[in-house]
């Protein structure tokens, strides 16, 4: 069974103040308040996602995080005790690889959001650069977000959790999920023995490998963090031409096949 890694926002009021679990994303630790100035919190249609600030006007997230009445919060660490520099924005425009907004669990799960007005940089708000080189299997990657820290039961944290996982060969994910095609524009990342993983509510957030922004949280096993069931992440490097083209104003640019 697989899980698209969004989480109903309806649970936030009920669970965001739940007792902290020894399982901290899952299997991680509380992120340092200064290590995620690019991480954004996205609410839509009673759901929660993450995202990444690329510059003062643009956020990159997963296509399956699209919905009505989207709100984007920047500079967030604790949801209970907000930083003084938290900023709220809404989308001005949304861009998808396919004009019909279609995507699959292994293709085109990527969305660019142009914000309604520029973001002001601050102590807790700063963009993350796009990757300058492709990802390498074996890299140590950092995943982060406000998603559930337990699975299948839901326990939402007050502050984002961070975990180190490994970039794995795509064939590892094909073995775990036979429905995957022979090739795709997704990355496979996790811990083979399980215990660390992104999960529900982390969708759209970044996967940072060797210091470079290489992936977008997309989907994975359900429950999360099971042995030999890594997560799938949209490959950012493969979509660089599309991302840069849209930001530059070229709306005719096409996504890779």
Curated annotation (Swiss-Prot):
Tissue expression as described in the entry: Expressed by the venom gland.
Function summary: Snake venom serine protease with fibrinogenolytic activities. Cleaves beta-chain of fibrinogen (FGB) efficiently and shows relatively lower activity on alpha-chain.
Protein name as it appears in the record: Beta-fibrinogenase mucrofibrase-2
Cross-referenced InterPro entries: Peptidase_S1_PA (IPR009003), Peptidase_S1_PA_chymotrypsin (IPR043504), Peptidase_S1A (IPR001314), Trypsin_dom (IPR001254), TRYPSIN_HIS (IPR018114), TRYPSIN_SER (IPR033116)
Assembly: Monomer.
Active-site feature positions: 64 (charge relay system), 109 (charge relay system), 203 (charge relay system)
UniProt GO cellular component terms: extracellular region; secretory granule
Location within or outside the cell: Secreted
Pfam families attached to this UniProt entry: Trypsin
Top-level taxonomic group: Eukaryota
Protein's GO biological process: proteolysis
Positions of the propeptide segment: 19-24
């Amino acid at each position: 069974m697989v899980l698209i890694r969004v989480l109903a926002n309806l649970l936030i009021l009920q669970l965001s103040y739940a007792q902290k679990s020894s399982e901290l994303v899952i299997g991680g630790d509380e992120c340092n308040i200064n290590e995620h100035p690019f991480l954004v919190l996205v609410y839509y249609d009673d759901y929660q996602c993450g995202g990444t600030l690329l510059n003062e006007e643009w956020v990159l997230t997963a296509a399956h995080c699209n919905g009505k009445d989207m709100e984007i919060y920047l500079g967030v660490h604790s949801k209970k005790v907000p930083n003084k520099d938290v900023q709220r924005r809404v989308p001005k425009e949304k861009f998808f690889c396919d004009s019909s907004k279609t995507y699959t669990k292994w293709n085109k799960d990527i969305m660019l959001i142009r914000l309604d007005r520029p973001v002001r940089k601050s102590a807790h708000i700063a963009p993350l650069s796009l990757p300058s080189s492709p990802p390498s299997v074996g890299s140590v990657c950092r995943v982060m977000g406000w998603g559930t820290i337990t699975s299948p039961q839901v326990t939402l944290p007050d502050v984002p959790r961070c975990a180190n996982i490994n970039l794995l060969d795509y064939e590892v994910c094909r073995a775990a999920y036979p429905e995957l095609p022979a090739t795709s524009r997704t990355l496979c990342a996790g811990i083979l023995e399980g215990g660390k993983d992104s999960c529900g509510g982390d969708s759209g957030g970044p996967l940072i490998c060797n210091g470079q922004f290489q992936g977008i949280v997309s989907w994975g096993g359900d429950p999360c963090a099971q042995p030999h069931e890594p997560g799938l992440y949209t490959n950012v490097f493969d979509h660089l031409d599309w991302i840069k083209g849209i930001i530059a104003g070229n709306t005719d640019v096409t996504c890779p096949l």
